[in-house]
Design a protein with these regions (language model features):
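C-terminal/peripheral segments of proteins
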Residues: 1-203, 211, 215-419
Length: 419
């Protein structure tokens, strides 16, 4: 097994050079020169200009189609459907080694010219999906398949919501003041816990599942709760867990579920609608969801903060958001079943971890952050749960940046080290 990043010794230098960059142009040039980011997408803005940069430029194995055709092993062919972007080549033949481009920074890696990037004057973004829609108005295509799909598959619900949020912000139609991405507005947007599956499918789903003459009293009550729900996962939202349990149980193939299939020319609005023929399957999923909630001991209209929480140091912190698969933009996704005490975020969850919103006022930097899981895993530490509780209260921490801000911090102290 060969790891392209096992031969990548440039990543720390890349980060150091980025920290010293004086402009967005310099930042972009550094990324192209180093091509060292091991696995993540990059988004960046600079000071004094309406420009935003997206790149999936890093250390990526160079396995073009002809190499895959000639060198993929029988095991690789058998696994291709499950792992389409993982090349499994015959390592016993030198002809099957990864290729090197003229502009490859590292032997065996894809050259910079064949890696996705985009510079825009409106916005860029990535919500853990492929590079294809870094901007909904400017799809990226023509890059090696190892970078992911490009227009051949529906985008995740969270990706669709993220782009929708950006476009609504620029249009000034999202309910926040103006149409600019100010720090204050962005800090509210990313925590507002919108649920895209509910925004797009709740009404037609309820029209199908709540009209059965044989609906139980519990189903009728759940329908009433969801009709009144505001399609958000805030701590006070009532009934969101019923929707989560329902939507996660919908296992109908896309061709039988959606009224309008995915269209790469309209990726944010497709697939959409629900087919009447899916009603029976949806009713079964809804009934099972209602039963699961009732068996859990949580009320159908329980506030989300009662169901989704973190319990540290004897204090329970109500949380918000949910899972990407359900279409939450704000991710706090518990792996704990609702029937085992609720959606606890204290086991092996996934979701928001380190968050930052940064703007560049004249002559300075303003950064607001969260470390959602807190700084320490020691229950005796004062920092075992403080950041988590602040996150639950949506109280961003303004971090000091300038020297005067650092020395003015109440926790500032100096330590002199000598040999």
């Amino acid at each position: 097994m060969r790891d392209i990043n096992g031969e990548n010794f440039r990543s720390l230098r890349n980060w150091l050079r980025w920290n010293q960059a004086k402009s967005l142009d310099e930042f972009m040039q550094i990324q192209k020169e180093e091509a060292a980011i091991p696995w993540v997408n990059t988004v960046a803005v600079g000071r004094g200009a309406a420009r935003a940069w997206y790149a999936d430029i890093g250390t990526v194995p160079n396995a073009p189609p002809d190499l895959l055709a000639a060198c993929t092993t029988p095991v690789g062919k058998a696994m291709a459907a499950a792992l389409p972007e993982v090349p499994i080549l015959d390592g016993a033949r030198s002809a099957c080694h990864w290729r090197t481009d003229a502009d490859s920074v590292q032997k065996g890696a894809i050259g910079v010219a064949r890696m996705p990037s985009l510079l825009r004057d409106d916005y860029v973004g990535n919500m853990n999906d492929s590079y294809w829609l870094a901007n909904a108005s400017a799809p990226l295509t023509g890059f090696p398949s190892i970078f992911g799909t490009a227009g051949t598959a529906a985008q995740s619900l969270r990706t669709r919501l993220g782009h929708t949020m950006a476009l609504e912000r620029l249009a000034g139609t999202d309910g926040y003041p103006g149409n600019k991405a100010t720090s204050e507005v962005v800090r509210q947007m990313v925590l507002n816990s919108r649920v895209f599956s509910a925004e797009r499918f709740k009404d037609p789903a309820l029209d199908l599942v709540c009209t059965a003459p044989s609906a139980s009293q519990d189903v009728v009550a759940a329908c009433a709760t969801l009709r009144a729900w505001d399609n958000r996962g805030s701590t006070s939202a009532r009934g969101s867990h019923v929707w989560d349990e329902f939507w996660s149980r919908v296992q109908v193939p896309a061709a039988q579920l959606y009224a309008v299939p995915f269209d790469p020319a309209d990726p944010l609005n497709t697939p959409r609608g629900l087919q009447p023929g899916a009603a029976d399957a949806l009713r079964q999923a809804f009934g099972a969801a209602v039963q699961a909630v009732k068996a859990s001991g949580f009320a159908l209209d329980a506030p989300r903060g009662d169901v989704l929480f973190s319990a540290r140091g004897g204090v329970r912190t109500a949380l918000y958001g949910g899972c990407s698969a359900v279409g939450y933009f704000t991710i706090n996704c518990s792996e704990n079943p609702i029937g085992q005490g609720g959606y606890s975020m204290d086991g092996q969850p996934h979701g928001n971890s380190y968050m930052q919103v940064v703007n560049f006022p004249a002559g300075g930097v303003q950064a607001y952050t969260f470390l959602t899981f807190s700084l320490s895993d020691d229950p005796g530490s004062a920092h075992y749960a403080d950041y988590t509780r602040a996150y639950g209260a949506q109280q961003w921490l303004r971090v000091p940046f300038a020297e005067a801000e650092i020395t003015a911090d109440k926790n500032y102290q100096t330590v002199t080290v000598s040999e």
